[in-house]
């Protein structure tokens, strides 16, 4: 029932559009936890932990049917902690599984888990006193299903050639913007729609993801455009010829003759044959398959190691702000002073709530900012050639052709140039974000919100595009998963930083923000290394005239 790779290629725009919608409404929806928390408390989850005589210290409205207390908040936040951990920690094993089995089975399992998550939450709400513990399993399945959908969608841009980075940025942007989903559901809930109805409807919509994947996603993984056998897999494997020539053999002849024609025609005075014999074709075809790059060399490459530091630092900066934004806003409103009267406390709560709502709504900007960084990564790629061939370089030198008169733009060099621009811009915005955090001006926080949202969309998109450009496509899932896992470990440091801010620093965020600002300067090390690596690669091209196959097998290892 699964389509072939050629059929999936013809449906690639449908798959891309539906993947964006699926990411937006079904991927990292746990990032909108604040709205879901209010719904769960209104439904009475873990209200049994509150004393019967409790007059909760949280705000209650007239529609509230259940008591609330700090114990209830702790239990529900524990569920969120488990779900968010699953969302981040499972990226590495998912990447390994996806590299081995392809995206189709992973996506099917992810959509099934998300469906089960919504169903469990709906069933648990029918008897919250007995079934409240199901929320832990439901949130775990929600996080796991969401990351499965996100990871598999990142392989789709391989079907779009020069638009790959832009499409990948759009996928990551829809993932980052999914934090708006639960606030939208809360609006529906506040309009009077029952929580059970909402969850069962959401579960039914998740079943459509399973159906869409079954009908349109192929069993094979999507090859990257720069792979040697990309054209064979996408365009030629289904080609039937009257002369009984198979797709593989036809591809071999086309590739061999293409390489021959791309070189300078040899002179008869050299004593070499000007034409290729059948033996030459067979001999060349034996060397045609791309040499496999070991995973350990990609893992130990300086590019990947520097990206781990940059992404971990940025993740810590972003997650800490998301965790402490309410406390920071409260400090800006109160100036660090406690207000005893209820009127003053209510005013502070309303102001913080308003700014928090604006910050949540701005997460949709990720859907617009992520394609922008993808456009930067795709800049002038379509005007590039793969690499200089040795025959071309030697022929030009022999005939006295000035290489400076015709300087082709090489794809590998251009991708590195675009990555340098993308990471430099992202780090500059991150530094600007850190500076605005240091300024005690409440209205300036709107600028801080915008910078935070842009950086959150930029750095994931830039990293994914860098990995796709530099490393072999069969390593993409493993490298991305390991990077996400390391970044999640870095993000755990936000808890002691938060405790230090609300404890010894008495709510003042200045010193923590200053330390994080200085730490964020390390992000410029990655584009600095990429600049050095690009210069070295340019020297190799100029000195050796490396061909495309040698570049693919050699330069990626030393990246």
UniProtKB/Swiss-Prot annotation:
Modified residues (Phosphoserine): 237, 262, 267
Glycan-bearing residues: 57, 212, 229
Tissue-by-tissue expression: Ubiquitously expressed in fetus and adult. Highest expression in adult pancreas, liver, skeletal muscle. In fetus, highest expression in liver and lower levels in kidney, and lung. Exclusively expressed in the glomeruli along the glomerular capillary walls.
Substrates-to-products reaction catalysed: D-leucine(in) = D-leucine(out); L-leucine(in) = L-leucine(out); L-isoleucine(in) = L-isoleucine(out); L-methionine(in) = L-methionine(out)
Location (main, coarse): membrane
Transmembrane segments: 20-40, 78-98, 105-124, 131-151, 168-188, 191-211, 304-324, 357-377, 419-439, 446-466, 485-505, 510-530
Localization per record: Cell membrane; Apical cell membrane; Endoplasmic reticulum membrane
UniProt KW Endoplasmic reticulum keyword: yes
Record's bilayer topology term: Multi-pass membrane protein
Assigned protein family: Belongs to the SLC43A transporter (TC 2.A.1.44) family.
Protein name: Large neutral amino acids transporter small subunit 3
